[in-house]
Amino acid sequence: MTDLKQFIKQEAVAIIAFIVAIISCIFVPVTNYVSYIDTDLIGVMFGFMAVVAGFSVNNVFKVLSEQVAALAKDTRNLALALVFMVFFMSMLITNDVALIAFIPFTVMMYEKIDKSPVYVIVLQTIAANMGSAFTPFGNPQNLYLFSASKMTSSEFFSLTLPVTAVSMLMLFIGCMMIKKEPIFLEKDEQKATVQNPKYLLLYAALFILCILSVFNVVDTISVFASVCVVV
């Protein structure tokens, strides 16, 4: 009984949402639910997730992180590099994936220089959300809105570009508030290397196909089938 109470307390929001969903079923015919499933959207999301997972498994993001961080010679430039790496990558690989891919590296880097990573991680979180808002495939919400609204590419980017520009400025200001201190990083003999580089061009081609399917240049079923065959 105690475990049940603890579960209800921890998952209160999920339980309430489930109950409300069940109640809503009374007012909507069951036959309508099938029409809610957007198979094209699910197919595109699967394609992006599978391809990004391929990049991740082959250490692409680790190598990118190390190369970007190596350019920084002080704490401020390190923050700029890490924050804007997440900002721009989230436009392509979605906000949550960008955070999962790069925050562990940020924590590791700040442990090496004996500094707290909290402020930079907060900026990275903001960067991931604001950067992902720029493209139709930056996050699932954008993907759905772009698909459902039938907007043209120019209409979509005319809405997101001003927000993205302001976000970049605010993130830059946030990074500039960090005190500039020199950092000295020992060369790591066990640098990350890209695994199976021969597959990277294939993954890149699939990623481009996924993007083209968002803009209805390529059929979603063809992309889904291609990803399934390769991955």
Segments predicted by a language model, with ranges:
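Generic alpha-helical transmembrane segments of integral inner-membrane proteins
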Residues: I19, F46, F84, F88, ...
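Transmembrane helical segments that form the transport core of multi-pass membrane transport proteins
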Residues: Y36, S65, F207-V231
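Membrane-interface helix termini and inter-helical loops of multi-pass transporters
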Residues: V28-I37, K62-Q67, N142-E155, I183-E189
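Membrane-interface alpha-helices at helix entry/exit sites of multi-pass transporters
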Residues: R76-A81, K112-L123, M151-P162
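Alpha-helical transmembrane segments and, especially, the helix-loop junctions at the ends
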Residues: S90-I100, P117-S149, L171-C175
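Residue-level signature of transmembrane alpha-helical entry/exit and packing/kink sites
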Residues: Q10, A14, D40-I42, T75-V83, ...
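Membrane-embedded alpha-helical segments and adjacent helix-loop junctions characteristic
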Residues: Y33-S116
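Juxtamembrane and boundary regions of transmembrane helices in multi-pass small-molecule transporters
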Residues: T2-L4, S154-L202
